[in-house]
Amino acid sequence: MSDPITLNVGGKLYTTSLATLTSFPDSMLGAMFSGKMPTKRDSQGNCFIDRDGKVFRYILNFLRTSHLDLPEDFQEMGLLRREADFYQVQPLIEALQEKEVELSKAEKNAMLNITLNQRVQTVHFTVREAPQIYSLSSSSMEVFNANIFSTSCLFLKLLGSKLFYCSNGNLSSITSHLQDPNHLTLDWVANVEGLPEEEYTKQNLKRLWVVPANKQINSFQVFVEEVLKIALSDGFCIDSSHPHALDFMNNKIIRLIRYR
């Protein structure tokens, strides 16, 4: 049995065998480790490859097993495909093509489920009436929560590109708030009467906007209308069994489906 070989791939170290690296002789790795191509070394004497080290684990596992094993929430398909092209592991390239066709079919049929919650709470704040003169005030504030689940990761990304939080006078995309590729939780408030703009920032109160309409979402009715526009344009339709179509705008749980 040959001695282990340690690779430095983009700063990540992997240890494997010569037999594994040459298991596909026509690949770039097969050529590198059969002496047909020169190899570079790092300062520790490890074989250095200036490529992405994170996804190389999936390439190495394929060399070991001839099977493509990816986690269910894998989000680096484009990167992995480019790396497979670089290493020229043809069976892996074909396996990735089959996987992408499978994912594409799964994306066509989809479900969208939205759970809405609303409450009213009192917010306390200070108001500057004159230089060095402040008064305490309070006002009722509507707080909204929406839990969104979709079997289509692409739709949630589309939705995330349309909705923005307003905080500290700036709009920021909600895509950074994705819990995972299939879940999104939104929390925001309506405009509060008499609340100074700086208090929204001080109390971490976010408002929600939809673009490109540049419309602030101050009620669930507006939220549902805007999400519905986006969903219908992406092929979704209202699930006739839940809720009843006549009561759609007033329901706290909304379900849409897509068949293609």
UniProtKB/Swiss-Prot annotation:
Q: In which pathway does it act?
A: Protein modification; protein ubiquitination
Tissue specificity, per the record, is: Highly expressed in cerebellum and brain. Expression is down-regulated in medulloblastoma.
Known SUPFAM superfamilies for this protein? Answer: POZ domain (SSF54695)
Q: Does the keyword Coiled coil apply?
A: yes
- Which GO biological process annotations does it have? negative regulation of smoothened signaling pathway; protein homooligomerization; protein ubiquitination; ubiquitin-dependent protein catabolic process
What stretches pass through the bilayer?
none
Q: Residue limits of the BTB domain? A: 3-72
Query: Keywords, A to Z?
Result: Coiled coil, Growth regulation, Tumor suppressor, Ubl conjugation pathway
Q: Coiled-coil stretches, from where to where?
A: 88-112
Domain of life, per UniProt, equals: Eukaryota
Example GO molecular function: histone deacetylase binding
Q: How does it assemble?
A: Homopentamer. Interacts with KCTD11; KCTD21 and KCTD11 may associate in pentameric assemblies. Interacts (via BTB domain) with CUL3; indicative for a participation in a BCR (BTB-CUL3-RBX1) E3 ubiquitin-protein ligase complex.
What is known about what this protein does?
A: Probable substrate-specific adapter of a BCR (BTB-CUL3-RBX1) E3 ubiquitin-protein ligase complex mediating the ubiquitination and subsequent proteasomal degradation of target proteins. Promotes the ubiquitination of HDAC1. Can function as antagonist of the Hedgehog pathway by affecting the nuclear transfer of transcription factor GLI1; the function probably occurs via HDAC1 down-regulation, keeping GLI1 acetylated and inactive. Inhibits cell growth and tumorigenicity of medulloblastoma (MDB).
User: Which PANTHER family does the protein's record reference?
Assistant: BTB_POZ DOMAIN-CONTAINING PROTEIN KCTD21 (PTHR14499:SF57), POTASSIUM CHANNEL TETRAMERIZATION DOMAIN-CONTAINING (PTHR14499)
This one is known as: BTB/POZ domain-containing protein KCTD21
Origin organism of this chain?
Homo sapiens
Name of the encoding gene? KCTD21
